[in-house]
Amino acid sequence: MLRLPTVLRQMRPVSRALAPHLTRAYAKDVKFGADARALMLQGVDLLADAVAVTMGPKGRTVIIEQSWGSPKVTKDGVTVAKSIDLKDKYKNIGAKLVQDVANNTNEEAGDGTTTATVLARSIAKEGFEKISKGANPVEIRRGVMLAVDAVIAELKKQSKPVTTPEEIAQVATISANGDKDIGNIISDAMKKVGRKGVITVKDGKTLNDELEIIEGMKFDRGYISPYFINTSKGQKCEFQDAYVLLSEKKISSVQSIVPALEIANAHRKPLVIIAEDVDGEALSTLVLNRLKVGLQVVAVKAPGFGDNRKNQLKDMAIATGGAVFGEEGLNLNLEDVQAHDLGKVGEVIVTKDDAMLLKGKGDKAHIEKRIQEITEQLDITTSEYEKEKLNERLAKLSDGVAVLKVGGTSDVEVNEKKDRVTDALNATRAAVEEGIVLGGGCALLRCIPALDSLKPANEDQKIGIEIIKRALKIPAMTIAKNAGVEGSLIVEKILQSSSEVGYDAMLGDFVNMVEKGIIDPTKVVRTALLDAAGVASLLTTAEAVVTEIPKEEKDPGMGAMGGMGGGMGGGMF
């Protein structure tokens, strides 16, 4: 029997032989205090500098290399922020934290990402400087948040509700970098579908921007067979006052659809069949009857896949007042169909590529309840794909959908413009929600006097308040700097002027901001400050930073190649 010491002695040579191969992957590197903060600040500076150049009406664009396709040209702050990834791990941590500020602001308000980024840089930079001189970072953070609360309260006092289409157009124009055409098209869209209506942005097919209003439920599935066409003009099938049969399952047998056809025939109504598929003898019988006796029917494949298809069919059932056959939990068979199981619509248009159900006769209360359910799902989902699909479903159930088709001469131009249109649309929605304040960074400047009355608990909190006082000047200074003038002089002149006067960077003049329509949504300014202060003041409290040391790849060397050559040589003869 072997004793334990003997076993261990025998294992030693083995462990020595294996030692070079048993290396730890992903070891960590730790930096403390001023060293760590200095490196993070360099990352913050790099990201903020790249984003800041896009600010204001005379801001420049940024060109971003992409892993595929042509480079992206943009003036959208959050797009620039997201594209930055630094090689140095410590610098990258600083950059990523400010990137989070831009992302949060974009998700909550849809605009104001550049403002949030320059504010975050200012707060972090000043905070680091004060801490290096011995101030307490925790108390500085308390002072910063105290000042931010006071500024937000003051912003709410300054805020005015958006009432007219002209004001909506002004907000959209400012956010679209002074493009009045974009401002007007968004204002028109809101006029047509209502302020809470659904507005989507898509690539256009022409050189000009277009606005299309879609009423009812439109989905991208056309007729299954061209024999269903009933108009000579436009290769489409059109019905007035029709019944709708909805099925989750494939329809192949004729017997299953005869009862529905008999009901439609008895009521002298056309029938629209929307199912997973219609094929076999069911399809051939429908086509034959359509051609021989002029049967008023059209078959369409249900849109989407999996759960998305089920949800869309359920939406159609609610919008038209019908039921979905084959739905889990409901023992509804197509053979037992009754008139009340069929949906009812005022008008149906089916083309080769899409179908539209207009003037659905569904119960308004049920539709409202369904809209509420989808809105609640939207609030909790984090997936961008899910959000897109939920928004599409919401749009179809709402009164109408406005589609902004962005035109241009090339993909690069369309994509750049699309970024601005999306920003403008988000800013407009934010303005309708919480009102408007002076634009051009003036609203934040007008909040500075409100900080004078604050009573900090100690000297370090007072430093935090002073940090915010200086940060509030940064957006206006950045806009002026991008317009080629001295920012600090512009800011001082604005502070000495009456409350509605600000700097119009486009004209290079001091004007009444409200009369000129240079306004920002309150929600955008508030969110930008809150997110920037929260993350930047947390950044200043960091005393240690832990990063992963990249795994070193061993150089295989050239020895293997030589051996391989010899082996091959030996094998050849």
From Swiss-Prot:
Top EC class, one word: isomerase
Protein localization: Mitochondrion matrix
Binding site for ATP: K75, D111, G112, T113, T114, T115, G440, D520
Gene that this sequence comes from: Hspd1
Annotated function: Chaperonin implicated in mitochondrial protein import and macromolecular assembly. Together with Hsp10, facilitates the correct folding of imported proteins. May also prevent misfolding and promote the refolding and proper assembly of unfolded polypeptides generated under stress conditions in the mitochondrial matrix. The functional units of these chaperonins consist of heptameric rings of the large subunit Hsp60, which function as a back-to-back double ring.
GO cellular component terms, A-Z: cell surface; clathrin-coated pit; coated vesicle; cytoplasm; cytosol; early endosome; extracellular exosome; extracellular space
Recorded family membership: Belongs to the chaperonin (HSP60) family.
Name the UniProt record assigns to this protein: 60 kDa heat shock protein, mitochondrial
Top-level taxon in the UniProt lineage: Eukaryota
Main subcellular localisation: mitochondrion
Phylogenetic placement of the source organism: Eukaryota, Metazoa, Chordata, Craniata, Vertebrata
